[in-house]
Structure formats: structure tokens, C-alpha cells
């Protein structure tokens, strides 16, 4: 099950972080921020190939004992990080990929909103409902 979903700005500050067990919220914030180093390494390793590539899914960033951390980066260098419970072995890579695409589409809808200033924290009921449905879908 997905326990945390985060949207991180190009400058590496959080635009949106949602975690399911709220008592471990600080732990998930730490996990998301430590994963940004791995995201930056993967982006720099891809170099110019990332610009030409349409698939922006970074895959498994790193596993821990309890969780697996996955990453995705947009063309505008906004990063999506998803922390998944490692006990969920039924979750496949293509399902994670489609969840990131759905998250990216919802983020694009927010960016198209004329009342949203790019770089501000995301406060959207529609985005919250989409994230909640994704977290429940994975359960």
C-alpha cells in the first residue's frame, strides 16, 4: 500500500506531501527528502538522454526494510515521490508507472488553473481526492 505521496518543486522544496499514518509523518518527510539525492543522481546520470526521452519514470529509487521508494520527474524538473509498503508484493512496476502518470495528469490540471501560482503549495480538493483514491487503490 502507498503510505506517502509527495510532489517536490524544481528547487527541492515540497509542494505537496500526503501520508496515510499521520503519526509517522515526520519519518515520511525525511524519507522523501533523502530520496531527492537519488533522484538527482539518476537525472544527472541520464544527462541529455532524459531530455529526449518521453518516459520520465525513474523506477525504484531505494528500498528500506519497511518501504520501497519510487520516483518520477517531469519535463519541468518537478519530482513525484511515492513511498510504498514493501509487504505489498502484488504491486507491479507498471502499476506504479500508471499511478505516476495519473498523478502527473492531475498536477498538469492544477498548473492549468489560472488561480494557481506555480511554485506555491498545492491546496486542491480534486488533487487530494485523486491522491486518496490512489492510496486506497493500492491497498
Curated annotation (Swiss-Prot):
Subcellular location(s) per record: Cytoplasm, Perinuclear region; Endoplasmic reticulum; Golgi apparatus
Origin superkingdom: Eukaryota
Similarity field: Belongs to the TRAPP small subunits family. Sedlin subfamily.
One Gene Ontology cellular component annotation held by this UniProt entry: perinuclear region of cytoplasm
Record SUPFAM superfamilies: SNARE-like (SSF64356)
GO biological process terms on file: endoplasmic reticulum to Golgi vesicle-mediated transport
Family annotation (PANTHER family): TRAFFICKING PROTEIN PARTICLE COMPLEX SUBUNIT 2
Name under which the protein is recorded: Trafficking protein particle complex subunit 2-like protein
Task of the protein: May play a role in vesicular transport from endoplasmic reticulum to Golgi.
Record organism: Taeniopygia guttata (Zebra finch)
